[in-house]
Structure formats: structure tokens, C-alpha cells
Amino acid sequence: MNIFEMLRIDERLRLKIYKDTEGYYTIGIGHLLTKSPSLNAAKSELDKAIGRNCNGVITKDEAEKLFNQDVDAAVRGILRNAKLKPVYDSLDAVRRCALINMVFQMGETGVAGFTNSLRMLQQKRWDEAAVNLAKSIWYNQTPNRAKRVITTFRTGTWDAYKNL
């Protein structure tokens, strides 16, 4: 298991524009196109991102390219963020993937707002961090994914992603 496999489970591949859990137009493996309510705006963003007229549909290869760019952007966001980088640096490889997963979903600014949980993670207080993360709006909005990510933080294993 790695971050790419983890996110493929949590995001799934969709080759046609869809609305995510927050109602935002998305495509591929969790690639946010726009927060605009306009489907035409989403199609325009997609055409720019891919470099051709897509009419709201992309190939698997195009989805993979966007996905790789998005994972790279999430990691870069963590490394440049003064609140996230020290936490990331303190984590083992599996737990780093859990943090990348959160940033992929919510953005670096969103995750940086988890001040208490981040402090607990940096201090390796896994059980307390898990309890705290489960009290979040994020947990209520995407409970299945949040449970898997939280279990990954708590255990430092891929157990939550086995057999999925």
C-alpha cells in the first residue's frame, strides 16, 4: 500500500465530471475542477487542465496525470506550510500518507486548522489524536474515509485499507 493506492480507495476513479460530497465539480481521482456551481465553468477548467475539448469526459491516462499532479501538490503544500511540515517530519511513512490524504481532500489550509489534533500527532499521542479527529466536521462529512484515515494515524498500519 502507498499514498496512491490509499487515495484510489478513498476517491475512486471517475472519468466523467461529477459532484463530490460537498457539491463541487470533480473528475478523475478526486481532482477538484471548481467550486463554481456552473457545469460550463467546470468543463472549461477541465479543458484547460487537459489541453483539449473534453466535453466533461477524460481518459484513464488523463485522470492519472491529474492525480499525480494533485498528490505532488498536496505534498508540496505540506512541506511549505509552517504548521504541517513539523508534524509531517515527525511521522513515520504510513502516517505521513494519512496526512497527505487529509491535505488531498481538504487542502493544506483546511488541515492546518486541526491545531490540537496536529499537536497530538506530533507528540505521538495517537489515541488522543484519533478521538479528537473523530469530533471534527470532516469526520461527519465523510465518516467512512475519516475512520480509515484516523485508524491509519492511530495504528501506523494499513489495516483500515485491507480488503477494500
UniProtKB/Swiss-Prot annotation:
Record keyword Kinase present? no
Could you give a single Gene Ontology term from the biological process aspect?
Answer: viral release from host cell by cytolysis
What residue ranges carry the coiled-coil annotation?
Answer: none
> What molecular functions are annotated in GO for this chain?
lysozyme activity
Binding of substrate: at which residues?
Answer: 32, 104, 117, 132
| Record annotation: effect of changing residue 20 to E/Q | Loss of 99% of enzymatic activity
* Induction, as annotated: Expressed late in the viral replication.
**Catalytic reactions on record:** Hydrolysis of (1->4)-beta-linkages between N-acetylmuramic acid and N-acetyl-D-glucosamine residues in a peptidoglycan and between N-acetyl-D-glucosamine residues in chitodextrins
Pfam families with a match to the protein in the record = Phage_lysozyme
Spell out the InterPro entries in the cross-references.
Endolysin_T4_type (IPR034690), Glyco_hydro_24 (IPR002196), Lysozyme-like_dom_sf (IPR023346), Lysozyme_dom_sf (IPR023347), Phage_lysozyme-like (IPR052619), T4-type_lysozyme (IPR001165)
* Phenotype for residue 117 to I: 500-fold decrease in enzymatic activity
Q: Which Gene3D superfamilies match?
A: 1.10.530.40
What, per the annotation, is the impact of changing residue 11 to N? Loss of 84% of enzymatic activity
Impact noted for substituting residue 117 to F? 10-fold decrease in enzymatic activity
Q: Is the Hydrolase keyword given for this protein? A: yes
Q: Which UniProt keywords apply?
A: Antimicrobial, Bacteriolytic enzyme, Cytolysis, Glycosidase, Host cell lysis by virus, Host cytoplasm, Hydrolase, Viral release from host cell
Q: Which GO terms describe its cellular component?
A: host cell cytoplasm
Give the consequence of mutating residue 30 to F.
Answer: Almost complete loss of enzymatic activity. The enzyme is destabilized by 1.5 kcal/mol
Q: What EC numbers are recorded for this enzyme? A: 3.2.1.17
Report the active site residues: 11 (proton donor/acceptor), 20 (proton donor/acceptor)
PANTHER family recorded = T4-TYPE LYSOZYME 1-RELATED
Family the entry assigns: Belongs to the glycosyl hydrolase 24 family.
Query: Tell me, what does this protein do in biology?
Result: Endolysin with lysozyme activity that degrades host peptidoglycans and participates with the holin and spanin proteins in the sequential events which lead to the programmed host cell lysis releasing the mature viral particles. Once the holin has permeabilized the host cell membrane, the endolysin can reach the periplasm and break down the peptidoglycan layer.
Q: What is this protein called?
A: Endolysin
* Native organism: Enterobacteria phage T4
